[in-house]
């Protein structure tokens, strides 16, 4: 070795590469109440032991890099490093492990979901020593969650604003999602709201296209809201999508919505980004607007069981970033979602305190302290025959959203809305009388058809529609 490259052991530094597990695998570590805890599903490359793989995840998502560096000596790695503190095999898998990592709180900027994800999932998912990696869950300590505003208003404030209690709320996504003029779009909203729905909704990709500019849509939808409110005596809303190409444009659209006096706006939080979403959530709280969140792009991230990030993590992140509603799947409709797993992250959205429950995919006990809850939105391929199951699964604090299940009614939009409202009221009344919706649901709907011709027509149209596919992402048995 030449004098120029010789390591000077006397100064406490030894150049070269050493196994991650020597520094970052610490099974003796006792987690702190202030640590952010992560559960990763790790699939190492052949020949890589799980301890090395778990330690590599901890290192590359915190203070580590591929080689020893001089500047390690200028800080306290013991204070700042992530630690892989526990590893367990995945049931039924030969080469998968759940690796638990603890991160010191000081690694993260206060009130920034963007920074949290940049650290925990920003770089390590491309690591060559791993065949696949999935973030299954996070434990967010109150010391960190209290640095976030969270939802602009929350469930109770929304009910008070709408003056609607004791039942799920009803919505409808306007279809076709693209191509309607602003006036025809507003007319469709009016018919649905007049027929009995609480909300209508922009689809996720309705922004400001040549066939319908955002300002025109906002004006005609506001007209629909005010006209339907005057006729029904109920407070109505339309999720006006404020998502835009820049944060400045997004806020401009939200400001215009507020000037129109509408109750709620909408954002695509994954395609729009967490920084934009948190900005909009702060504006909505300051200005009395509810915020509906669409999860467009989520399945790119969360659908595959072995790689990516589970939706329960995205749901927790949304609760911190801010939103009053978020789409959560339906269990019974056309979109992915196993029942117990869906109920697990629905509780993480709504409840203050959620116990660890691996049977529902919840890896950590989560205490949200006083952070407001988020209403889950069941949307995607649902119709009146699903109403008993949806009411039983999601309960009162939910939005049940029927797009094609409203607009596809043979008699038109308003009868479609009336059919859904009658079906919902029948299910809520039956539940309150002590009847079993899971067992008696079809009977309850058939009985309601006798005094609602709109519901009878809807039941006839969709009597044979089913989406019988097994979910891709399931709980480990």
From Swiss-Prot:
Post-translational modification: The disulfide bond which can form between Cys-247 in the large chain dimeric partners within the hexadecamer appears to be associated with oxidative stress and protein turnover.
Residues the record lists as N6-carboxylysine modifications: 201
Site note Not N6-methylated, residues: 14
Cofactor: Mg(2+)
Positions contributing to substrate binding: 123, 173, 177, 295, 327, 379
Residues flagged as site, Transition state stabilizer: 334
Cellular localization per UniProt: Plastid, Chloroplast
Keywords: Acetylation, Calvin cycle, Carbon dioxide fixation, Chloroplast, Disulfide bond, Lyase, Magnesium, Metal-binding, Monooxygenase, Oxidoreductase, Photorespiration, Photosynthesis, Plastid
Ligand binding (Mg(2+)): 201, 203-204
Enzyme Commission no: 4.1.1.39
InterPro entries documented for this protein: RuBisCO, RuBisCo_large_chain_AS, RuBisCO_lsu_C, RuBisCO_lsu_C_sf, RuBisCO_lsu_fd_N, RuBisCO_lsu_N_sf, RuBisCO_lsuI
Cleaved propeptide residues: 1-2
MF terms in GO: magnesium ion binding; monooxygenase activity; ribulose-bisphosphate carboxylase activity
Cofactor note: Binds 1 Mg(2+) ion per subunit.
Protein family membership: Belongs to the RuBisCO large chain family. Type I subfamily.
Stored PANTHER family: RIBULOSE BISPHOSPHATE CARBOXYLASE, RIBULOSE BISPHOSPHATE CARBOXYLASE LARGE CHAIN
Note: The basic functional RuBisCO is composed of a large chain homodimer in a 'head-to-tail' conformation. In form I RuBisCO this homodimer is arranged in a barrel-like tetramer with the small subunits forming a tetrameric 'cap' on each end of the 'barrel'.
The protein's assembly and partners: Heterohexadecamer of 8 large chains and 8 small chains; disulfide-linked. The disulfide link is formed within the large subunit homodimers.
Name of the protein: Ribulose bisphosphate carboxylase large chain
Gene it is expressed from: rbcL
């Amino acid at each position: 070795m030449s004098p120029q490259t010789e390591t000077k052991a006397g100064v406490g530094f030894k150049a070269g590469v050493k196994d991650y597990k020597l520094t970052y695998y610490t099974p003796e570590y006792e987690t702190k109440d202030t640590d952010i805890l992560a559960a990763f599903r790790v699939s190492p490359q052949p020949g890589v032991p799980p301890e090395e793989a778990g330690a590599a995840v901890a290192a590359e998502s915190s203070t580590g890099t591929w080689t020893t560096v001089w500047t390690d000596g200028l800080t306290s790695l013991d204070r700042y490093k992530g630690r892989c503190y526990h590893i367990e095999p995945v049931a039924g898998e030969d080469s998968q492990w759940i690796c638990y990592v603890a991160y010191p709180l000081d690694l993260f900027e206060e009130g920034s979901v963007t920074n949290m994800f940049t650290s925990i999932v920003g770089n390590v998912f491309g690591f060559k020593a791993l065949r696949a990696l999935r973030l299954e869950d996070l434990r967010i300590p109150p010391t960190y969650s209290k640095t976030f505003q969270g939802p602009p208003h929350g469930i109770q404030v929304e009910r008070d604003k709408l003056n609607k209690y004791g039942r799920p709320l009803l919505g409808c996504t306007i279809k076709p999602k693209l191509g309607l003029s602003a006036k025809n779009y507003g007319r469709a909203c009016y018919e649905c709201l007049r027929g009995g729905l609480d909300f209508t909704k922009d689809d996720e990709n309705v922004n400001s296209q040549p066939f319908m500019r955002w300002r025109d849509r906002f004006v005609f939808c506001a007209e629909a809201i005010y006209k339907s409110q005057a006729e029904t005596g109920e407070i109505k809303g339309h999720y006006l999508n404020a998502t835009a190409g820049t944060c400045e444009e997004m806020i401009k659209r939200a400001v215009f919505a507020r000037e129109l006096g509408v109750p709620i706006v909408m954002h695509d939080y994954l395609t729009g980004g967490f920084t934009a979403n948190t900005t909009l959530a702060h504006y909505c709280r300051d200005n009395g607007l509810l915020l509906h969140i669409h999860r467009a792009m989520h399945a790119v991230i969360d659908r595959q069981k072995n790689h990516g990030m589970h939706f329960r993590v995205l749901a927790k992140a949304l609760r911190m970033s801010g939103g009053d509603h978020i789409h959560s799947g339906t269990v019974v409709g056309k979109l992915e979602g196993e029942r117990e797993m869906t109920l697990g992250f629905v509780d993480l959205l709504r409840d203050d305190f959620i116990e660890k429950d691996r049977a529902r995919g919840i890896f950590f006990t989560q205490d949200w302290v006083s952070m407001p809850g988020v209403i889950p939105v069941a949307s995607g391929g649902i119709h009146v025959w699903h109403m008993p199951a949806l009411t039983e699964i999601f309960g009162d604090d939910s939005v049940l959203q029927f797009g094609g299940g409203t607009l596809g009614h043979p008699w038109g939009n308003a009868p479609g809305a009336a059919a859904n409202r009658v079906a919902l009221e029948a299910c809520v009344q039956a539940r309150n009388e002590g009847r079993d919706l899971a067992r008696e649901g079809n009977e309850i709907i058939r009985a309601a058809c006798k005094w609602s011709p709109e519901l009878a027509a809807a039941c006839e149209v969709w009597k044979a529609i089913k989406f019988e596919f097994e979910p891709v992402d399931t709980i480990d048995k």
